[in-house]
């Protein structure tokens, strides 16, 4: 019962559960429209991990949108362009200079990067190649340059960057056989909101 999305309206003193699916499903990612705090997109992830077993994905995984601050949610499905069948972990990123553009890195039967141009209602697959990342249950973060909606970063064993809205990716930071001393695991990435060339790994 502790899983799901919770909301506070008093600075964190009290919390209200606004989205719940089942006891195995939690929130993997949550993004908010910077121009409208009542519009959010949630990526829910059903998974189970035991010492001897791990299962990523299930009926509870999916994308949900709200335009009323979490009072009601709409689940997006294959009718909206998302992959069919059970989904796994989903990573989300919004273009802050154009909040109608949203990217979703989706673990599915065929892992792929999806893109929405209308704020999260309709989705189109833009890339299912190896450049989008590996081990999606472990790495599923992606980031958009705040000044350039077409520059997308995926962080995983490597760090890759796309300059064309996710259609193609090139290696930005090598992982192996490199002399940069960086351990080949990238789990966080930050881009300066006013200067896309200033990033922290």
Regions found by a protein language model. Give the residues of each.
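Beta-propeller blade termini and top-face loops
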Residues: 1-201
């Amino acid at each position: 019962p502790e899983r799901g999305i919770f909301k506070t309206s008093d600075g964190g003193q009290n919390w209200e559960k606004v989205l719940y699916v089942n006891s195995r499903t939690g929130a993997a990612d949550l993004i908010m429209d910077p121009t409208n705090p009542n519009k959010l997109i949630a990526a829910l992830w059903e998974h189970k991990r035991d010492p001897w077993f791990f299962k990523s994905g299930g009926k509870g995984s999916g994308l949900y949108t709200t335009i009323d601050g979490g009072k009601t949610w709409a689940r997006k499905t294959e009718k909206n362009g998302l992959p069919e069948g059970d989904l796994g972990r989903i990573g989300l990123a919004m273009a802050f200079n154009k909040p109608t553009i949203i990217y979703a890195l989706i673990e599915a039967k065929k892992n792929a990067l999806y893109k929405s141009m209308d704020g999260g209602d309709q989705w189109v697959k833009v890339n299912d190649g190896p450049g989008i990342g590996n081990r999606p249950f472990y790495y599923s973060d992606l980031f958009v340059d705040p000044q350039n909606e077409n520059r997308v970063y995926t962080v995983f064993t490597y760090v890759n960057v796309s300059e064309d809205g996710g259609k193609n990716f090139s290696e930005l930071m090598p992982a192996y056989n490199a002399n940069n001393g960086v351990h080949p695991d990238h789990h966080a990435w930050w881009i300066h909101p006013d200067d896309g060339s200033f990033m922290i790994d």
